[in-house]
């Protein structure tokens, strides 16, 4: 079975303080619930964990939904951002596509090629890059890299109202 592992972190979370930080964390959790609700009817059971305060990892048992799930998370964060914050709420997300050798209840403890590609990809993302997909196939990775860069450019211009639409 081909899985998608989404590994991400909140962009600029250290600059979000007090009540706004709690609201940001709540928004992230609600975005995970949105993903779960969206794919429940597709017989897919997404699962997510938050760790280190602003990092997260999720698994989709059908990789076809990975890009859309990432967009749902990012759009939800941008929609919920607090107006007086100096930075937009957003997430950097690395998607690893592949097999999983071990999938426990706590998804951040899993292992396999999909896990081992998503973590290092997140670590390599540049400041302006917020989405990257890694598959076992280099030609597809090259194509997806270009498409993710274009998608990042579009998302960067979203207002909260546009993200909600």
Stretches found by the model and what they are:
Residues 1-165:
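Regulatory and interdomain segments flanking nucleotide-handling catalytic cores
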């Amino acid at each position: 079975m081909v899985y998608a592992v989404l590994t991400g972190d909140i962009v600029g979370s250290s600059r979000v303080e007090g009540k706004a930080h709690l609201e940001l964390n709540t928004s992230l959790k609600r975005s995970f619930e949105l993903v779960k609700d969206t794919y429940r009817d597709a017989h897919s059971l997404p699962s997510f964990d938050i760790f280190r305060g602003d990092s997260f990892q999720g698994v989709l048992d059908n990789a076809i939904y990975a890009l859309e799930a990432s967009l749902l998370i990012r759009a939800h964060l941008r929609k919920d951002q607090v107006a007086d914050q100096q930075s937009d709420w957003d997430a950097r997300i690395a998607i690893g596509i592949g097999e999983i050798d071990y999938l426990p209840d706590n998804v951040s403890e899993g292992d396999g090629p999909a896990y081992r590609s998503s973590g290092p990809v997140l670590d390599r993302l540049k400041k302006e890059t917020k989405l990257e997909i890694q598959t076992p196939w280099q030609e597809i990775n090259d194509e997806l890299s270009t498409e993710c860069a274009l998608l990042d450019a579009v998302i960067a211009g979203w207002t909260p109202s546009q993200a909600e639409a």
